[in-house]
């Protein structure tokens, strides 16, 4: 034996689990898909774009960061909870390193169920993947904002407002996410 193993080690996750087959998101906040996207606006410049999308209402929360660490993703939970007009009870993530460690611990502290996808299955996170395409096409490809993080986050926050309150969504019968929430979930707290 040469000590080399062809088997990959399985990463143990203390809190995150696979989403049960029967788990359905019935109300806003039941399942929020979170993912990161590398945005390269200029040669040699990489920005980590975090997106959270509620699968019921299509409400999005977006933020840019200079790093794709678990600590940055954990800070994004504060942004998500402050900007979403509903409590978040479940988050679905891919197996990226930014969603381990501090992020997982923070979800556990907050009582948020954390579901991790099997490797190489982005189609199972389809809502947030589609949201990232929209943000790329309708924000990053047309924006004139500077790509310094504070200025970019201010522009992203305005884009998020437009996306959630002005831009109609075909999947919601051409309502905005805010109109959808007001029509179908009028009891939710307002952001």
Predicted regions mapped to residue ranges:
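Mobile-element integrase/transposase regions
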Residues: 1-53, 71-75, 86, 191
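C-terminal domain-tail junction helix/linker
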Residues: 7-24, 101, 110, 121, ...
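Residues immediately flanking
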Residues: 36, 55, 67, 95
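A structural motif
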Residues: 52, 127-136
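Active-site beta-loop-alpha junctions of metal-dependent nucleic acid enzymes
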Residues: 62-86, 90
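Basic nucleic-acid-binding interfaces
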Residues: 67, 113-117, 137
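RNase H-like polynucleotidyl transferase catalytic core
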Residues: 90-95, 109-127, 143-147
């Amino acid at each position: 034996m040469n000590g080399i193993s062809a088997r990959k080690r399985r990463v143990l996750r203390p809190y995150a689990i696979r989403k049960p087959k029967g788990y359905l998101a019935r109300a806003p906040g039941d399942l929020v898909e979170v993912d990161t996207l590398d945005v390269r606006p200029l040669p040699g410049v990489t920005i980590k774009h975090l997106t959270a999308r509620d699968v019921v209402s299509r409400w999005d929360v977006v933020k840019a960061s200079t790093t794709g660490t678990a600590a940055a993703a954990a800070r994004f939970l504060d942004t998500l909870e402050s900007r979403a007009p509903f409590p978040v009870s479940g988050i679905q993530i891919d197996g990226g390193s930014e969603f381990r460690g501090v992020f997982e611990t923070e979800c556990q502290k907050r009582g948020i169920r954390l579901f991790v996808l099997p490797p190489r299955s982005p189609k199972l996170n389809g809502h947030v993947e589609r949201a990232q395409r929209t943000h790329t096409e309708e924000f990053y490809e047309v924006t004139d904002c500077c790509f310094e993080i504070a200025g970019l986050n201010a522009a992203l926050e305005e884009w998020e407002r437009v996306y959630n309150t002005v831009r109609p969504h075909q999947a919601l019968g051409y309502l905005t996410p805010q109109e959808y929430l007001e029509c179908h979930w009028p009891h939710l707290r307002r952001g």
